[in-house]
């Protein structure tokens, strides 16, 4: 089961080495620290960090943040231990370290081209890592919310981000499962696959949710949030008529405390709702 979910943006601004004295930055960092600390306090047996990357892969658990891409001198200021990680995973690993977490962790990057079905299957696999799994999702919204945004100003961005925020605030992540991948690409939503991994990991409704930060500095929508536990599957109204007999479902046996990385084959997901791109 999922004990809790922390959502933080994979923003370079979180790295102290890359920022100046902008007053927005400390507020964002504090919000991410609070969310990560709440995740650690949920007593997970393992924490999975998920974020966008150039390829879909599991990275070494001892990997650390590396800032060499931002300048040769910054590379020498990166974390001294472990293999270099993609920026989103490196920032997530640092958040866990600074929150005092020393338990098992899994670092999973997701390629931007992964289809929704594969992302949700990946999320479903993550929830089976252990009896108590924490999830740190490094993701963000559109990058088209102002004239100085990376994607300039797009009038569709505000509505897109409102759907993201509404799903998280309400604790029902169903809208994330049918996210319009094409629209997300046009709005430069780098975290689209990570959102859909989250949707696969949390098929039920969150027990409690709290938004710690919501803003769009520099034209990019950042959301920092905490989702606690699960109430169970969202119930759908049954169709009238006689109930058909169904075969019993088999479950894999697993020893308590096992932490494994299961295979992640793609599965078909019914798309009964769509985000509008126009």
Which residue stretches match the model-derived regions?
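Long, Lys/Arg- and hydrophobic-enriched amphipathic alpha-helices
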Residues: 200-241
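A short aromatic-anchored loop/beta-hairpin motif
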Residues: 1-87
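Actinobacteria-biased recognition of intrinsically disordered, low-complexity terminal regions
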Residues: 1-2, 228-278
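Cap/lid and interdomain-hinge subdomains that line or gate substrate/regulatory clefts
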Residues: 77-124
């Amino acid at each position: 089961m999922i004990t809790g979910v922390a959502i933080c943006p994979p923003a370079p601004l979180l790295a102290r080495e890359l920022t100046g004295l902008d007053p927005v930055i400390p507020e964002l960092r504090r919000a991410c620290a609070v969310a990560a600390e709440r995740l650690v306090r949920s007593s997970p047996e393992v924490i999975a960090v998920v974020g966008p990357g150039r390829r879909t892969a599991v990275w070494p658990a001892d990997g650390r943040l590396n800032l060499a891409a931002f300048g040769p001198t910054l590379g020498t200021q990166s974390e001294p231990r472990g293999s270099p990680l993609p920026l989103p995973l490196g920032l997530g690993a640092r958040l866990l370290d600074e929150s005092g977490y020393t338990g098992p962790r899994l670092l999973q990057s997701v390629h931007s081209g992964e289809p929704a079905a594969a992302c949700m299957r990946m999320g479903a696999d993550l929830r089976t890592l252990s009896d108590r799994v924490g999830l740190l999702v490094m993701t963000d919204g559109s990058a088209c919310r102002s004239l100085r945004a990376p994607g300039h100003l797009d009038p569709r961005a505000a509505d897109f981000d409102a759907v993201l925020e509404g799903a998280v605030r309400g604790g029902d992540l169903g809208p994330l499962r049918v996210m319009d991948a094409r629209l997300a690409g046009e709005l430069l939503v780098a975290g689209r696959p990570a959102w859909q991994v989250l949707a696969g990991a949390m098929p039920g409704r969150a027990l409690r949710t709290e938004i710690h930060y919501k803003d769009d500095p520099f034209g990019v929508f950042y959301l920092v949030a905490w989702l606690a536990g699960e109430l169970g599957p969202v119930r759908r109204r049954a169709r009238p008529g006689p109930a058909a007999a169904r075969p019993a479902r088999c479950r894999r046996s697993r020893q308590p405390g096992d932490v494994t990385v299961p295979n992640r084959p793609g599965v078909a997901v019914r798309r009964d709702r769509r985000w509008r791109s126009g």
